[in-house]
Amino acid sequence: STIGYWLSQKTNYPFFDADKHLEEKENRIISDIFANEGEEYFRDLETKYLKELSERQGIIISTGGGAVKKKENIDILKQNGIVIFLDRTIEDISRENHENRPLLQNIENLWKLYDERINLYRKYADIIIKNDDDMDVVTDRIITTLKGKL
């Protein structure tokens, strides 16, 4: 989300965090949805709101890490956009605050999810960008790479 925001600032394209968009539309936080309705219900909502966002032109969308679990989500995003995977080490990911991410509450689960998803991220990405530097450098990498794709 942070990189998406920075990219938006540098390119003047509007930025949408898909998880925040979902929370605003549902008037609840994701952890409550998981706790009360479960992951499958959340994933269906995620798809619904990704469809809504992807109908817009010229925007930047940041998705949650699990969006890749449903191929339909990837197909939706690729219809009008370019899917960028920000490649980070699991060590870097583990240092973040994950209090609002129900599936990332312990390190064992983080490793499990990483192992489940990493190949999907790489498979579905149109572009893979190393996210191993400060925001300014990473956003410049994205912009430089996109210039060759647009």
Task: Identify the function of each model-found stretch.
Residues 14-16, 102, 127-129:
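Structural signal for short hydrophobic segments within the conserved structured cores
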Residues 1:
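Walker A/P-loop
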Residues 6, 10, 56, 82, ...:
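NTP-dependent small-molecule kinase module
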Residues 45-49, 72-73, 109, 116-117, ...:
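Short acidic active-site motifs
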Residues 64-67, 89-91, 134:
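Short glycine-rich anion-binding loops that position phosphate/pyrophosphate groups of nucleotides
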Residues 80-119:
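A glycine- and Lys/Arg-enriched "phosphate-lid" helix/loop adjacent to the NTP-binding pocket
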Residues 26, 34, 46, 54, ...:
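Short, flexible helix/strand-to-coil boundary loops that buttress conserved ligand/catalytic motifs
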